[in-house]
């Protein structure tokens, strides 16, 4: 066993999980349970009372965090220590939402002034587009933005832009392209007018295969519409570290925005990668997004573990992953604008914590990152919620809902809220056989049929969930919410003693993909790989099965 699983705290949590009463009983025994297991922070309210935990469980979890030196690990990230040890990098996405007066250093240099300069540069560009000062090659104002990226440079801007749709500047629309599948970009280009379209290309190296391929195709389309090479500077901007390649492409050096090694892709929406967001919602709202995240940064640094929202959520996830056998976690957003968040949190969590060796290279003997999935309420209630209620797998859930709607229409929002809260109650409470029989008592069925149907209507309950509320979905509350899950991911990784900030599995996929591409384009059939890979490559070369 590893040192972690041998610890007395770990062993005590195993014993505690086996003997804890049903949540129905925990609520019955403690009328103050909700008050004791809920908290406010940074415009968010967390109810974690519907979890398989009592005072003893929580004390053990906080002890586990202290044994892991969690407070010191959180501080190390904020201080710019090299916590991404396999790539020898600091992890400072938090610096992107820092205040101008802060001093945050990488290699002895304060990086805050450069961050602020980039924000100011973004503000000038955003203002020029939104006011119509920035015009296309025929003098028409920009109406459409195409964001081209992959991974964090695609998903973050897309999901945040989608979530903040009520704040979009009138007259601007945005389209997001990531997949190298030609159908993705072709379908987008069919909707566009080259004279009024702005392309934002995001790639640290300016060489990411999918992003570069899509950008080159966009350039070809642009030139085919009647534009010239000289017109590219008015319609293409880049977020990249490789200024040379971007200028060779035809971009104006003034419209090239920086990226830094101390920001990982899945944490980059706060940087110039968020330019598409800022173009849509304006720089003032983008700064509010940053401010909400900064508030959560200050909270995770300063709040005691027992009152620390990201810490509590992370420890509860560890509880289910390691002591209750949960293999997945569902995120359920009861707000149409937040429908993309499960996919964003999926990338954030699974790319960060899908690891199987500790920081010192030891193979883990415990589960790490669970599968993250989810969707939009109430749609899921007519699909996968059935499995949550009566399936054999334990799947902890996060319910997320604003108390106020951007579209207050009739009783829509009241019905949405009633479904959200009703689901959390049903998951916790379940339905006993006796309750099912009582519901059938007035039916005309005979006793044997009543008994049979009652067995099918039993729900064990004791299914855990968190409920996250906010007054209203705003740039600030969204910033807090995303930063909450970022820090939750950090805390999980700290407990599991893994590096949450590299992604070698992703890198291997890129490497092998490039090798396969070369074989697809070779003069002869593939023969050097395994029989399956050879056959698949050769079938593709033939264009038929």
UniProtKB/Swiss-Prot annotation:
Keywords, comma-separated and alphabetical: Cytoplasm, Gluconeogenesis, Glycolysis, Isomerase
Active site positions: 351, 382, 510
Pfam families reported in the protein's UniProt record: PGI (PF00342)
Catalytic activity reported: alpha-D-glucose 6-phosphate = beta-D-fructose 6-phosphate
Record-listed E.C. numbers: 5.3.1.9
Keyword check for Cytoplasm: yes
BP-aspect Gene Ontology terms: gluconeogenesis; glucose 6-phosphate metabolic process; glycolytic process
Example of a GO MF term: monosaccharide binding
Pathway terms, separated by semicolons: Carbohydrate biosynthesis; gluconeogenesis; Carbohydrate degradation; glycolysis; D-glyceraldehyde 3-phosphate and glycerone phosphate from D-glucose: step 2/4
Annotated InterPro entries: G6P_Isomerase, G6P_Isomerase_C, Phosphoglucose_isomerase_CS, SIS_dom_sf, SIS_PGI_1, SIS_PGI_2
Enzyme class: isomerase
Subcellular location: Cytoplasm
Record-level GO cellular component terms: cytosol
PROSITE patterns cross-referenced by the UniProt entry: P_GLUCOSE_ISOMERASE_1 (PS00765), P_GLUCOSE_ISOMERASE_2 (PS00174), P_GLUCOSE_ISOMERASE_3 (PS51463)
NCBIfam families assigned: PRK00179.1
PANTHER family in alphabetical order: GLUCOSE-6-PHOSPHATE ISOMERASE (PTHR11469:SF1)
Described purpose of this protein according to its UniProt entry: Catalyzes the reversible isomerization of glucose-6-phosphate to fructose-6-phosphate.
Xref: HAMAP family: G6P_isomerase
Family the entry assigns: Belongs to the GPI family.
Protein's UniProt name: Glucose-6-phosphate isomerase
Gene for this chain: pgi
């Amino acid at each position: 066993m590893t040192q972690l699983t041998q610890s007395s705290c770990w062993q005590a949590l195993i014993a505690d999980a086996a003997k804890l009463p049903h949540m129905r009983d925990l609520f019955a025994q403690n009328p103050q349970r909700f008050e004791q297991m809920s908290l406010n922070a940074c415009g968010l309210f967390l109810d974690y009372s519907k979890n398989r935990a009592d005072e003893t469980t929580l004390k053990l979890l906080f002890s586990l965090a202290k044994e892991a030196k969690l407070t010191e690990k959180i501080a190390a990230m904020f201080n710019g220590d090299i916590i991404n040890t396999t790539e020898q990098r600091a992890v400072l996405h938090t610096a992107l939402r820092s205040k101008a007066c802060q001093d945050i250093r990488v290699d002895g240099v304060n990086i805050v002034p450069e961050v602020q300069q980039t924000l100011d540069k973004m503000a000038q560009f955003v203002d020029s587009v939104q006011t119509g000062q920035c015009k296309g090659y025929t003098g028409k104002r920009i109406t459409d933005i195409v964001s081209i990226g992959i991974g964090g440079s695609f998903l973050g801007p897309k999901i945040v832009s989608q979530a903040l749709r009520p704040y979009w500047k009138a007259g601007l629309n945005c389209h997001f392209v990531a997949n190298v599948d030609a159908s993705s970009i072709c379908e987008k280009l069919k909707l566009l007018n080259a004279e009024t379209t702005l392309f934002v290309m995001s790639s640290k190296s300016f060489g990411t295969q999918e992003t570069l391929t899509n950008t080159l195709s966009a350039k070809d389309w642009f030139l085919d519409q009647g534009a010239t090479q000289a017109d590219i500077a008015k319609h293409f901007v880049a977020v990249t570290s490789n200024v040379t390649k971007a200028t060779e492409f035809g971009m104006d050096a003034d419209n090239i925005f920086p990226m830094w090694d101390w920001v990982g892709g899945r944490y980059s929406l706060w940087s110039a990668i968020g330019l598409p967001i800022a173009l849509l919602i304006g720089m003032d709202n983008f700064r509010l997004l940053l401010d909400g995240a900064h508030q959560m940064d200050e909270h995770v640094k300063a709040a005691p573990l027992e009152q620390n929202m990201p810490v509590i959520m992370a420890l509860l996830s560890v509880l289910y992953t390691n002591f209750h056998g949960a293999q997945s976690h569902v995120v359920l957003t009861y707000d149409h604008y937040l429908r993309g968040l499960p996919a964003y949190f999926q990338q954030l969590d699974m790319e960060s914590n899908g690891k199987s060796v500790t920081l010192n290279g030891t193979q883990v003997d415990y589960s790490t990152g669970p599968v993250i999935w989810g969707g939009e309420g109430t749609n899921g209630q007519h699909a996968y919620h059935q499995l949550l209620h009566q399936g054999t797998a334990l799947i902890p859930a996060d319910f997320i809902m604003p108390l106020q709607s951007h579209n207050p229409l009739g009783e829509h929002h009241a019905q949405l809220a009633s479904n959200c809260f009703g689901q959390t109650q049903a998951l916790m409470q379940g339905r006993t056989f006796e309750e099912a029989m009582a519901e059938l008592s007035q039916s005309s069925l005979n006793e044997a049929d009543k008994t049979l149907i009652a067995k099918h209507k039993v729900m064990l309950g004791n299914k855990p969930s968190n409920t996250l509320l906010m007054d209203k979905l705003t740039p600030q509350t969204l910033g807090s919410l995303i930063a909450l899950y970022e820090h939750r991911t950090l805390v999980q990784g700290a407990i599991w003693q893994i590096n949450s900030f590299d992604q070698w599995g992703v890198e291997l996929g890129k490497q092998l993909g490039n090798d396969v591409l070369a074989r697809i384009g070779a003069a002869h059939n593939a023969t050097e790989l395994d029989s399956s890979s050879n056959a698949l490559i050769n079938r593709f070369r033939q264009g038929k099965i």
